[in-house]
Amino acid sequence: ANEIRATEPKDIMTEIEGYVDSVLAVTSPILPLIHLLNRCMCFTEESAVGTQKCSDPREAFLELLEEIRQEQRQCVDKIGKVGSRLIARRDKVATFSTSGSVMEILKNAVTEGKEITAAAFEARPNSEGYRTLQEISELGIPVTFGCDALLCKLVPGSKMFFIGADAISSTGEVYAKTGSYLAALVCSEFGIPFYVAADTSKFDPLSLLGFPIKDSLRPA
């Protein structure tokens, strides 16, 4: 938004639409981003027909982006507080790949002095689990780290397993990092509660119409 150079309202809207098209051309179908871009396009359309009243469209657009950022921050904060209630003192908590919502849950548990331990797992192809390992360690949580082949070895003894989500459908299907399904099966085998930490930005409204959720494929 800070790169917008146009000064006339119509030109500003055209420039915003151009940026949205550029992002859509190169991004994988990550739902929170898609929802963000949809709100940007709604802003330009409302401005074009006059339902969005503003003297400075560029400033109004920046305010919209800040509003969205604040909404997302509030959602993550609430997830952290609700999720940490599930954790008791000295529980072992397992997680897979990288999730800001899951990390917020762990941060809250540490802040509440619950002295937890953790098990984290590597996720391919981008090795997101290494980032999770670093972030958990920085919280001062003792953590055991392994690849997905060690799920059956390291998950037993955990009180719960948390993952984030890429998308959630109207039928309750959860799309997450490859390997999450294996983790769910292991938890089912050992009777360990398995939780998905996500807010409504991960819900795909097109699934209400029967459209399948697009798989977010990433190159190895």
Task: Locate each region found by the language model.
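Nucleotide donor/acceptor-binding cores
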Residues: R90-D91, I116
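Short glycine/proline- and acidic residue-enriched helix-loop micro-motifs
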Residues: L62-Q70
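Long amphipathic alpha-helical segments
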Residues: A1-A60
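Predominant activation on well-ordered alpha-helical scaffold segments within soluble catalytic domains
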Residues: A1-N2, E17-V20, I34-M41, K81-S84, ...
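Short, glycine-rich nucleotide/cofactor-binding loops
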Residues: I4, K92-T98, S170-A176
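A short, well-structured juxtamembrane/interface segment
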Residues: E71-A88
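Conserved phosphate- and dinucleotide-binding cores of soluble alpha/beta proteins
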Residues: E104, T111-E115, F121-A220
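Gly/Ser/Thr-rich loops at beta-strand to alpha-helix junctions
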Residues: P29, K92-V93, S97-M103, P125-N126
